[in-house]
Amino acid sequence: MKTSAYVKELQAQSVEQLQAQLVDAKKELFNLRFQNATNQLDNTARIKEVRKNIARIQTVITAKAAE
């Protein structure tokens, strides 16, 4: 999914949905880091992608709180 489409999708969601999505993304990041530490992770670029998605979600949550 393209970044701009993903951000627009995030902006359309409620804060509660974003919070739930943030928790899921953080759990995924934890699992990816664990897999990477045990040399089971094939696609290490996924860690960077998930980190960026977490930042995008947090940015949208902050913007909605400021409104």
From Swiss-Prot:
One of its GO terms (cellular component) is cytosolic large ribosomal subunit. The keyword Chaperone does not apply. It comes from the Bacteria. InterPro entries: Ribosomal_protein_uL29, Ribosomal_uL29, Ribosomal_uL29_CS, Ribosomal_uL29_sf. Disulfide bonds: none annotated. One of its GO terms (biological process) is translation. GO terms for molecular function: structural constituent of ribosome. Keywords: Ribonucleoprotein, Ribosomal protein. Coiled coil: none annotated. The keyword Transmembrane does not apply. Transmembrane segments: none annotated. Gene3D superfamilies: 1.10.287.310. Belongs to the universal ribosomal protein uL29 family. PANTHER family: 60S RIBOSOMAL PROTEIN L35/50S RIBOSOMAL PROTEIN L29, LARGE RIBOSOMAL SUBUNIT PROTEIN UL29C. This is Large ribosomal subunit protein uL29. It comes from Agathobacter rectalis (strain ATCC 33656 / DSM 3377 / JCM 17463 / KCTC 5835 / VPI 0990) (Eubacterium rectale).
